[in-house]
Amino acid sequence: MLCGGTSQPVDADEQIQKICDSMKPHAEAQAGKTFDVFVAKTYTTQCVPGTNYFIKVHVGGDEHVHLRVYKKLPCNGETLELSKMLQDKRHHDPLEYF
């Protein structure tokens, strides 16, 4: 990984699913709809003053969304915020910086 670049995509784990679970209401508000399915599939990270998580999330059928979630540093409370969401993604779409 380059300094400031993103890591290689890896399979999502329980920690990443917990992040997605906490971001689901924010993603639904941004999308203007509810998601019956919201399962993290893969993710990458970017080290900034905190951490950016880029997460591919299955939302039903062949539909996915890509989330960018920012986690603040411990000295700033380690809170999470949904920075951006890309909709109309598919399983085969690469998870890239956005």
Curated annotation (Swiss-Prot):
What tissue specificity does the UniProt entry give?
A: Ubiquitously expressed in normal and lipopolysaccharide (LPS)-stimulated tissues including brain, eye, gullet, heart, liver, muscle, stomach, kidney, spleen, pyloric ceca, intestine and gill.
Activity control, as annotated, is:
Greatly decreased inhibitory activity against papain protease by metal ions including ZnSO(4), CuSO(4), HgCl(2) and CoCl(2). Decreased inhibitory activity against papain protease by detergents including Tween 20, SDS and Brij 35.
Per the record, pH dependence is: Optimum pH is 6-7.5 and pH 6.5-8 for papain and bovine cathepsin B, respectively.
Q: Which UniProt keywords apply?
A: Cytoplasm, Immunity, Innate immunity, Protease inhibitor, Thiol protease inhibitor
Q: Where is this motif: Secondary area of contact?
A: 46-50
Q: Where is this site: Reactive site?
A: G4
Its main localization is cytoplasm
Q: Where is the Cystatin domain?
A: 4-83
Question: What InterPro entries does its record include?
Answer: Cystatin_dom, Cystatin_sf, Prot_inh_stefin
* GO CC, alphabetical: cytoplasm; cytosol
Presence of keyword 4Fe-4S: no
What biological process terms from GO does the record include? cellular response to bacterial lipoprotein; innate immune response
Q: Cellular location of this protein?
A: Cytoplasm
Q: Name one GO molecular function term.
A: cysteine-type endopeptidase inhibitor activity
Query: Temperature annotation for this entry?
Result: Stable between 20 and 40 degrees Celsius. Activity for papain drops rapidly over 60 degrees Celsius. Retains inhibitory activity against papain for 10 days at 37 and 30 degrees Celsius.
Q: Superkingdom, according to UniProt?
A: Eukaryota
Reported induction: By LPS. Slightly increased expression 24 hours post-injection in spleen and muscle.
Identify the Pfam families for this entry: Cystatin
Spell out the family assignment given in the record's similarity comment: Belongs to the cystatin family.
What exactly does this protein do?
Thiol protease inhibitor. Has high papain, bovine cathepsin B and fish cathepsins F and X inhibitory activity and inhibits fish cathepsins L, S and K to a lesser extent in vitro. May be involved in innate immunity.
Name recorded for this polypeptide:
Cystatin-B
